[in-house]
Curated annotation (Swiss-Prot):
Name the UniProt record assigns to this protein: Mu-segestritoxin-Sf1c
Protein purpose: Insecticidal toxin. It inhibits insect voltage-gated sodium channels (Nav) by partially blocking the channel pore in DUM neurons from the American cockroach, not by acting as a gating modifier. The inhibition is only partially reversible after prolonged washout. In vivo, the toxin causes flaccid paralysis followed by death when injected into Heliothis virescens larvae. It also causes uncoordinated movements followed by full paralysis to sheep blowflies (Lucilia cuprina).
Entry comment, domain topic: The presence of a 'disulfide through disulfide knot' structurally defines this protein as a knottin.
Keywords: Disulfide bond, Knottin, Secreted, Toxin
Bridged cysteine pairs (disulfide): C3-C19, C10-C22, C18-C42, C24-C40
Keyword check for Disulfide bond: yes
Expressing tissues: Expressed by the venom gland.
Organism, scientific name: Segestria florentina (Tube-web spider)
GO molecular function terms noted in the UniProt entry: toxin activity
Keyword hit for Transmembrane: no
Segments of this protein annotated with the region Keys region for toxin activity: 31-33
Lineage: Eukaryota, Metazoa, Ecdysozoa, Arthropoda, Chelicerata
Family per similarity comment: Belongs to the neurotoxin 16 (SFI) family.
Subcellular location: Secreted
Length: 46
């Protein structure tokens, strides 16, 4: 299965498709909301 490269926007439904991790700007507390609004992007594995 192909994975999404760093910089690709990741949402709740596809956050596991990142090659690395799905990183959100405001940290884990705001994560569900951030993912819904598209503020999270794939990045290096944590």
């Amino acid at each position: 299965k192909e994975c999404m490269v760093d910089g690709t926007v990741c949402y709740i439904h596809n956050h596991n498709d990142c090659c690395g991790s799905c990183l959100c700007l405001n940290g884990p507390i705001a994560r569900p909301w951030e993912m819904m609004v598209g503020n999270c992007k794939c990045g290096p594995k944590a």
